[in-house]
């Protein structure tokens, strides 16, 4: 049977949300490929994990969730060397399985791990790779994977095909789609495979893991993101965005313009040339809404725009718009949130001058 694979990600034995997003993409592709070639296509979720509880092993309930969210099969490759990400060993493990089972398509998330793993894997399998895709589809008639991604600095969208080599491989931007809802009635198989010790790269040993103190990657996982753009006018004014983000308990984002001007660092950039996000609330101030930026926030649940220009493109996508001076709106909103938080805590908010 033909197969479409998605490579799941785990941390400490817990599956990351991007694993379920990928399954939604994979399910659609497997169904379309099956219709195009006239035969069933199985969606397989490949999990690389540790072999002991408490040391990166993914339990049965978590693997079962992959079935409930769209997979037909789950293959968990397990071994102590897979408890934490190590590119050479991960790549060797997936390549060994791929040579045996010959999937048509392999997808991974365009995370730091996926962006490291997939090029190594493509070289090992003598296959092509399209990175940072925002759209994937199956071409009618040929059954080829259509891989769409931003090109030329995000100014155009290019669609790429791989007609002559298998597997077809792509990384997909996190938060560019939503996971399928869980369906407890779905049936599927779960297979655990022990990693062949010969595949372990002995040159690399993971001694420990440390979390990024600045939490830049949290932007993609944040439920609230506050972004600033060119309308802030200068770097010092970006504090208005940070203060509002703090008041909302959210992460700080930025438009490409703001990053290019040095007001925020690249890990905060939102859009096709930065990070694709899907928070519950996205509030942007001074962002006009270039097409690349809009594409990076299109799956946000609620979008609020603050911009003095009533014709700014961002207003067309926003659920709520404020046509006004951000230098008045943001401080007032931050102050109102601070007052509400203080009231909830039973404290009187401080006024300018230090008295309540």
Residue ranges, per PLM feature:
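N-terminal glycine-rich FAD/FM-binding segment characteristic of electron-transfer flavoproteins
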Residues: 1-356
């Amino acid at each position: 049977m033909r197969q479409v694979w998605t490579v799941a990600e785990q941390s400490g034995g817990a599956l990351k949300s991007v694993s379920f997003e990928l399954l939604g993409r994979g399910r659609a592709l497997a169904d379309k490929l099956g219709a195009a070639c006239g035969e069933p296509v199985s969606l397989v979720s490949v999990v690389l994990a540790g072999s002991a509880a408490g040391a990166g092993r993914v339990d049965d309930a978590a693997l079962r969730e992959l079935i409930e969210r769209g997979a037909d099969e789950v293959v968990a490759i397990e071994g102590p060397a897979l408890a934490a990400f190590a590119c050479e060993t991960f790549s060797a493990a997936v390549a060994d399985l791929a040579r045996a089972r010959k999937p048509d398509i392999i997808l991974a998330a365009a995370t730091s791990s996926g962006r490291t793993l997939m090029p190594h894997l493509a070289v090992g399998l003598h296959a092509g790779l399209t990175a940072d895709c925002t759209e994937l589809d199956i071409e009618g008639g040929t059954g080829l994977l259509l891989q769409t991604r931003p090109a030329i600095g995000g100014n155009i969208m290019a669609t790429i095909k791989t007609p002559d080599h298998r597997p077809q491989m792509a990384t997909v931007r996190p938060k560019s789609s939503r996971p399928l809802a869980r369906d407890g009635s779905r049936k599927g198989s779960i297979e655990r495979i022990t990693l062949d010790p010969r595949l372990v790269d002995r040159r690399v040993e993971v001694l420990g893991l440390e979390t990024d103190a600045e939490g830049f990657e949290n932007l993609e996982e944040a439920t609230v993101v506050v972004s600033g753009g060119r309308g802030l006018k200068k770097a010092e004014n970006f504090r208005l965005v940070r203060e509002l983000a703090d008041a909302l308990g959210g992460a700080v984002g930025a438009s490409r313009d703001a990053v290019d001007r040095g007001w925020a660092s690249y890990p905060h950039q939102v859009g096709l040339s930065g990070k694709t996000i899907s928070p519950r609330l996205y509030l942007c101030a001074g962002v006009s809404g270039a097409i690349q930026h809009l594409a990076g926030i299109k799956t946000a649940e609620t979008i609020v725009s603050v911009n003095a220009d009533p014709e700014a493109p961002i207003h067309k996508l926003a659920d709520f718009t404020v046509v006004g001076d951000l230098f008045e709106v943001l401080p007032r909103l931050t102050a109102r949130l601070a007052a509400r938080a203080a009231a909830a805590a039973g404290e009187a908010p401080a006024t300018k001058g230090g008295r309540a």
